[in-house]
Amino acid sequence: MTGYQDLDWANDPVPKLRKFYNLERESIAHFSASDVAIEETHFSSGVGLKFTPEKISYGTDILYFHGGGWIVGSPWTHKTLCSWLAKFAERRVYAAPYALAPENKFPKQANQASEITNSFLKTRDKILLAGDSAGGAMVLCAAAGVIEKNKILGIASLYGAFGCTKGTSHQTYGDNSVDLKMSALFAMYAHLGCEDPSEFQAKLSLSGAPLLLVKAECDPIADDNDWLAQRTLHPVTHMIAKGQAHAYLQECGNSKEADASMRKIAKWINNLV
């Protein structure tokens, strides 16, 4: 049987990638935080997941956008990560679905992120935005299109992908990365319809709420964070995960390093309130 690491993310058919990505994420679901209730809930984009920790200390909810290079992933593939975020932040996390490529081309995803967020805000005074990888960019697309921007308390972008391909990190880790290679990154942007990143980057919010940029040190797209920080007016806090690769937070519940990093992310979030 094909294993997750045997997949060719640059050339394999997307349905195959989705199948085995889902299986891989299902295999770690048992590492989810045991004292967090997980249930289905509805968004303007469809059915997603709600994570309710046993201990709730803060009333401001987190709206979460999952990663997966815009071609794979769902709230279900990020159950483990979101459950630990909910536990450590002591607040509810809502993971929303969104349209994937190549069936849906950009800017569908960016526009949908704004629609989801505006709908989510209709019944809330304040929210926090968080997302990883592709979702780390989706939160900035969401923030750019929010009608009531003062309702966004903060934004946490976890090893976000912002359309860069030529930095030092891309050259250093692009060929030997376990979780993300440059060939796969180019393929993902192509599936999205964004071989030219300028249209994609133009959809990212450039001002507003405090922004946390979490960078995995051994990640090909680590330099994307520096590129964004140089161009944004968001108040930026940098967090570097030493020795970690892309998507390392999927190891929460099974890695002391991932857990420690998620605790720091939760602390940053909670210090905003």
Where are the regions a protein language model picked out?
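A glycine/proline-hinged amphipathic helix-loop "lid/cap" segment
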Residues: 1-54, 273
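Alpha/beta-hydrolase superfamily serine-hydrolase fold, recognizing
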Residues: 4, 43-49, 56-273
